[in-house]
Amino acid sequence: ALKDINYVIANIPDHALAYYNRGIIYENLGQPTQAIQDYSHAINLQPDLLEAYHYRGIVRYGMKDLDGALADYNKAISLGLKSSAVYFNRGVIFHQKGQLSDAIESYSRSIEIDPSNARAYYNRAISKLIVDNYKEALQDLEISKRLGYSKAAEIISQYY
């Protein structure tokens, strides 16, 4: 697949989707620097390629660049990406940065887009527990458990 994508890029150097797809390949090969370069090139060629921001954010997060990842997630959202995953990922970063109200809001948007996202309910519950909102946290944990997320059941049995 990489050979084919390289052929396309060599012959059509302004093919944004080819760079985006090669970025995915590099990411899967464990080559994050090359993945970021290709996602960035795809974005330069086609600034409305929303998933390129999302995937670049994922790679940046994996490289511990929380601010870069957050900027990419925010850009994807501001350009109109309606993805449960991008809101979920943004919530994780907000949580790690201690911005719990922003984390809760992001998890809530993730849930609005995909009400079956058990991990979003779970993560929102954890953020709510930290801010002492135990009643709503328990509600989220119950939903997460009902949706099959085993960690929710563990927390319920441990703390409730």
List PLM regions with ranges.
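Alpha-helical tetratricopeptide repeat
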Residues: 1-160
